[in-house]
């Protein structure tokens, strides 16, 4: 592979972009009940997400170039593998390309535009304010599913998935901040755990409970049948076990393991939505 291409892929954190694209594909397939006749629109949506996500990741590296000279000197920018000017032009080309392609669907266009603005604000203003930053990360994580649904003209079911993902991600980000409390303090970061200590764990648990309470809605509203309900209830039991573990021992070590545990369960929740759309 051409070294320059490799460095640009590293700049945009290509694995993160592919993960976001995959989430968009899953969202589109769920919303279309796995109608592969609409796969062209879904793949187009996943490309847009890849481009906009790449813009956000590149912009973060541009903002962090001075810090990365110390902490991550081998990244493309601090190591001068890519110039700051080239990285800036490249990042905005990604964003503009994504927004132009999104014009095939006006809801997709609106989301792509809003998310690009949110990513810009996150990189420029809120990255070190995790109280707001965590909400932004949670929103962006959930929005990929709505984007997939919008590409096939059905956002209803993905709206519930969006809310479940938003609250679960928000919860997990706060728990991660609790684990990283000492490091964040030394770097002057603002976070709920820094402001409220162990009480922030109760906020995280509250958000996780919101996700649990919303999860049966597809069954209650008649969107999905019993197989979905059975699958999501298993996920909810696992979530509750994570909550009980945190309540019993809200230590940084338990927070670290709970964060990883919650991430696994979130993937199982996504699988439950897939089961619901297929059965």
Curated annotation (Swiss-Prot):
InterPro entries from the UniProt entry: DGGGP_synth (IPR023547), Prenyltransferase_related (IPR050475), UbiA_prenyltransferase (IPR000537), UbiA_sf (IPR044878)
CDD domains xref list: PT_UbiA_DGGGPS
Subcellular location: Cell membrane
Pathway(s) this gene product operates in, as recorded in its UniProt entry: Membrane lipid metabolism; glycerophospholipid metabolism
Membrane topology, as annotated: Multi-pass membrane protein
GO biological process: glycerophospholipid biosynthetic process
Superkingdom, natural source: Archaea
Segments passing through the bilayer: 14-34, 36-56, 94-114, 131-153, 157-175, 201-221, 224-244, 259-279
GO MF term list: geranylgeranylglycerol-phosphate geranylgeranyltransferase activity; magnesium ion binding
Family: Belongs to the UbiA prenyltransferase family. DGGGP synthase subfamily.
Designated name of the protein: Digeranylgeranylglyceryl phosphate synthase
């Amino acid at each position: 592979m051409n070294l320059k291409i490799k460095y640009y892929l590293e700049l945009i954190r290509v694995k993160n972009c592919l993960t976001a694209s995959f989430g968009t594909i899953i969202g589109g397939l769920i919303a279309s009940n796995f109608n592969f006749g609409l796969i062209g629109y879904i793949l187009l949506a996943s490309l847009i997400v890849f481009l906009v996500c790449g813009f956000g990741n590149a912009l973060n590296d541009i903002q962090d170039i001075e810090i990365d000279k110390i902490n991550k000197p081998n990244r493309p920018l601090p190591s001068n593998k890519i110039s700051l000017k080239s990285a800036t032009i490249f990042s905005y080309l990604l964003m503009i390309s994504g927004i132009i392609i999104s014009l095939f669907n006006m809801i997709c266009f609106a989301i792509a535009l809003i998310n690009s603005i949110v990513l810009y604000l996150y990189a420029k203003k809120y990255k070190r304010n995790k109280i707001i930053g965590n909400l932004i990360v949670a929103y962006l994580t959930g929005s990929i599913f709505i984007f997939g649904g919008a590409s096939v003209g059905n956002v209803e079911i993905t709206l519930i998935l969006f809310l479940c993902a938003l609250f679960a991600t928000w919860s997990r980000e706060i728990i991660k901040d609790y684990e990283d409390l000492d490091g964040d303090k030394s770097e002057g970061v603002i976070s709920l755990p820094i402001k409220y200590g162990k009480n922030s764990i109760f906020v995280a648990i509250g958000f996780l409970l919101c996700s649990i309470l919303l999860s049966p809605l597809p069954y209650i509203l008649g969107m999905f049948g019993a197989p979905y309900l059975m699958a999501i209830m298993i996920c909810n039991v696992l979530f509750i076990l994570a909550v009980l573990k945190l309540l019993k021992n809200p230590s940084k070590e338990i927070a670290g393991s709970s964060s990883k545990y919650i991430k696994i369960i979130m993937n199982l929740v996504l699988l439950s939505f897939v089961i619901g759309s297929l059965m």
